[in-house]
């Protein structure tokens, strides 16, 4: 899986997944923290642990788009390009700069990554990705700033994993990803 290769590259270790979960590392060698962010590689791993069944959210923000993979219990829930389209006062706006990390935070409860991108006409988008490890939920949000009042239309798409169904809440923007088997 892509997130395993990213973990190996970022951590510089051959021990990942089941090896770390089983504690097979050399005695006295500390198991690395499960979540990890590398600014220069523009990669983030938000994860609950090293077991193959633990939840993993891998974020690649190289270039002008974001790739996101989400895994839980060994199953891919989401995976691929996070496609967006934004319109301000009916006019489509495009990115003028690449994504930049503006905040990385990780403690025993959550992993949080915030990315910023500048769009046409000085519009800025802040993308928030938060994984709550204990409660096992993923929060994804885009915030827009433009300096003046305007109408905004913003849509995004994330490819679902095999047999995963998106069940949106009718009155809010909350959703559940459900095993369609």
Where are these predicted regions, by residue range?
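Catalytic and substrate-binding regions of extracellular carbohydrate-active enzymes
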Residues: 2-180
């Amino acid at each position: 899986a892509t997130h395993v290769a990213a973990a190996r590259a970022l951590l510089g270790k051959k021990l990942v997944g089941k090896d770390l979960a089983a504690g097979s590392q050399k005695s006295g060698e500390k198991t690395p923290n499960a979540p990890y962010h590398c600014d220069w590689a523009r990669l983030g791993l938000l994860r609950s642990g090293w077991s193959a069944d633990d939840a993993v959210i891998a974020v690649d923000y190289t270039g002008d788009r974001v790739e996101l993979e989400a895994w839980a219990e060994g199953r891919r829930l989401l995976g691929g390009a996070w496609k967006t389209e934004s319109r301000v006062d009916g006019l489509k706006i495009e990115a003028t700069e690449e994504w930049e990390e503006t905040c990385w935070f990780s403690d025993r409860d959550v992993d949080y990554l915030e990315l910023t991108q500048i769009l046409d006409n000085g519009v800025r988008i802040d993308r928030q990705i938060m994984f709550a490890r204990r409660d096992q939920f993923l929060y994804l949000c885009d915030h827009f700033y433009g300096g003046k009042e305007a109408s905004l239309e913003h849509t995004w798409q994330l490819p679902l994993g095999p047999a995963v169904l998106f069940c949106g809440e009718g009155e809010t923007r909350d959703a559940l990803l459900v095993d369609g088997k």
